[in-house]
């Protein structure tokens, strides 16, 4: 079967004449090497490659409503858990050989897959490790999106004005690992589709709802309306995390502060309880990503034990 070309126009990718595309389901046949028989994208200065590379900028992501997923782990999770949002997958010949299962899953899902030279891959993203996907941005902003994400929730992480993309991505990953039902980024926080955030989630961005663009007051109101106890993580807390079993057993949301300034006073005043993590060594504090992981896992453990006793 020869590669097929989409008949659907896309003004983001309007140079379709240079788009060698393989769309599944199909069998990959290889004679000498994993990309044999398939044309390779080799022009790093083409308009298409430039537009994909441009998605590293926030204004381009907002305009085109799509973002980059870089690296094998992120691309694999996008293909497995959000194939309907994956618009294109790009991989080098070396990456195709190392990660043939991603090729197979993408083709089986009917996705467009493109083999590129390393030079083209580097032009699109120097951090892609040979694998890159362009993914449609999910519309999950504002109060209605928060209410929908919180329906039936037991554990939620809320980031208030988080600015560090690595920390934001790590918190999304920790929330996913702890079994949280959603992550809310209060208005003024970093864009969760920024490349470093996406990389730091290691694919968790596609495992649970991530809601943005909601004011802090509206977020707390939605949390209370969903029946969640709102806990603020702060070093000046009235409760020690490891002595607050009754708080942790409840369905709850953790408010997590800005890396430099912690939680704002309005967040502390709206919380049902302010909880601190004890420091046993000489460190002044934990960074927000580490603190989030500790708090979320403490709640997950307490909820599981309480459920087992019920």
Regions found by a protein language model. Name each.
Residues 3, 114, 140-237:
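RNA substrate-binding interface of SAM-dependent RNA methyltransferases
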Residues 107, 131, 200-204, 248-251:
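Short, hinge-like loop/turn segments at secondary-structure boundaries
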Residues 1-165, 188, 309-310:
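Arg/Lys-rich RNA-binding interfaces used to dock onto structured RNA substrates
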Residues 41, 67, 160-161, 184-187, ...:
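Glycine- and other small-residue-rich loops at beta-strand/loop junctions that grip anionic moieties
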Residues 231-283:
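Active-site/ligand-binding-proximal alpha/beta "capping" segment
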Residues 70-73, 119, 163, 193, ...:
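Short beta->alpha linker loops
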Residues 71, 164-171, 286-291:
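Amphipathic alpha-helical repeat scaffolds
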Residues 133, 174-178, 189-205, 265, ...:
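Structured adenosyl-cofactor binding patch, chiefly the S-adenosyl-L-methionine
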């Amino acid at each position: 079967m020869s590669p097929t070309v989409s008949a659907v126009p896309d003004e983001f990718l309007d140079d379709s004449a240079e788009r060698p595309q393989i769309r599944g389901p199909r069998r990959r046949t290889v004679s000498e090497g994993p990309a044999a028989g398939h044309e390779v994208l080799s022009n790093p200065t083409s308009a298409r490659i430039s537009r994909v590379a441009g998605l590293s900028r926030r204004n381009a992501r907002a305009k085109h409503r799509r973002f980059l997923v870089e690296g094998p782990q992120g691309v694999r999770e996008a293909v497995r858990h959000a194939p309907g949002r994956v618009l294109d997958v790009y991989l080098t010949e070396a990456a195709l050989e190392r990660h043939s299962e991603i090729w197979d899953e993408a083709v089986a899902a009917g996705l467009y897959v493109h083999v590129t030279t390393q030079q083209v891959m580097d032009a699109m993203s120097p951090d892609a490790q040979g694998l890159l996907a362009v993914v449609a941005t999910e519309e999950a902003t504002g109060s209605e999106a928060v209410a929908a994400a919180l329906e039936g929730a037991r554990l939620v992480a809320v980031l208030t004005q988080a600015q560090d993309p690595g920390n934001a991505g790590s918190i999304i990953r920790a929330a996913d690992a702890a079994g949280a039902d959603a992550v809310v980024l209060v208005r003024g926080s970093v864009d969760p589709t920024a490349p470093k955030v996406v990389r730091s989630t290691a694919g968790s961005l596609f495992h649970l709802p991530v809601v943005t663009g909601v004011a802090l007051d509206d977020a707390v109101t939605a949390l209370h309306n969903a029946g969640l106890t709102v806990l603020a993580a702060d070093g000046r807390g009235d409760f020690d995390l490891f002595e607050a079993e009754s708080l942790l057993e409840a369905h709850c949301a953790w408010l997590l502060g800005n890396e430099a300034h912690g939680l704002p006073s309005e967040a502390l005043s709206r919380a049902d309880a302010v909880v601190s993590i004890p420091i046993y060594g000489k460190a002044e504090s934990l960074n927000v990503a580490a603190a989030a992981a500790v708090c979320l896992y403490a709640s997950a453990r307490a909820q599981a034990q309480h459920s087992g006793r019920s």
